[in-house]
C-alpha cells in the first residue's frame, strides 16, 4: 500500500468534486480497504486485479497492482475511476472475464441478492485468488445480505471449508 502527494491531492479533488466522495474515506471504509491491502501485501507475483463494487476507486488507488479493472453499476463512480483504470459498468453477475486475473475482489457482498451473488461467484475463473468482503450493518437500506456473524458470511458466500 503506497501513495504520495499526487494521490492525496487526487483524493482531495474527489472529495471536492462529488458530494458523496467523502464517504469513501469514512473510518470503516478505510479500515476495510486497508485490511484488503494488508492481506494482499505479500502477493508480489500478483499483477492483475478486478474489483467489484469499486465505487470511486479508492481501493484500486491503494493497491499496488499494475493492472486493475474497476467494476460498478453506477456510471458516476466509474467516470472518476476511468481517469486511471479500465472500467466495466453493469451488474456483477453479467461480468465476463477476458483473462484470468490474479485476484478478484468483491467488496459489495451485502449489496447484492443471493441470486446475483451466486451467478457472479460461479464465474470466478479457476486459478484466480479471491477476496470477499461484507459487513453486519443491517441498518443500511441497500444491505440485502448483511450477515449476523462469520459463520453466516461463510455460508452464504460459499466460503465453507467442509
Tell what function each PLM region has:
Residues 44-56:
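Conserved class I S-adenosyl-L-methionine
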Residues 67-72:
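Conserved SAM-binding motif I beta-strand of class I
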Amino acid at each position: 500500500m503506497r501513495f504520495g502527494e499526487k494521490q492525496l491531492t487526487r483524493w482531495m479533488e474527489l472529495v471536492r468534486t462529488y458530494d458523496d466522495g467523502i464517504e469513501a474515506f469514512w473510518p470503516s471504509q478505510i479500515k476495510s480497504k486497508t485490511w484488503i491491502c494488508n492481506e494482499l501485501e505479500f502477493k508480489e507475483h500478483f499483477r492483475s486485479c478486478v474489483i467489484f463494487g469499486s465505487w470511486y476507486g479508492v481501493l484500486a488507488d491503494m493497491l499496488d497492482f499494475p493492472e486493475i479493472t474497476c467494476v460498478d453499476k453506477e456510471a458516476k463512480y466509474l467516470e472518476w475511476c476511468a481517469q486511471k483504470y479500465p472500467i466495466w459498468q453493469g451488474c456483477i453477475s453479467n461480468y465476463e472475464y477476458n483473462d484470468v486475473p490474479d485476484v478478484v475482489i468483491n467488496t459489495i457482498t451485502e449489496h447484492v441478492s443471493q441470486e446475483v451473488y451466486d451467478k457472479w461467484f460461479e464465474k470466478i475463473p479457476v486459478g484466480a485468488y479471491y477476496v470477499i468482503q461484507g459487513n453486519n450493518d443491517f441498518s443500511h437500506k441497500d444491505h440485502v445480505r448483511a450477515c449476523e456473524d462469520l459463520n453466516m458470511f461463510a455460508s452464504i458466500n460459499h466460503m465453507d471449508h467442509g
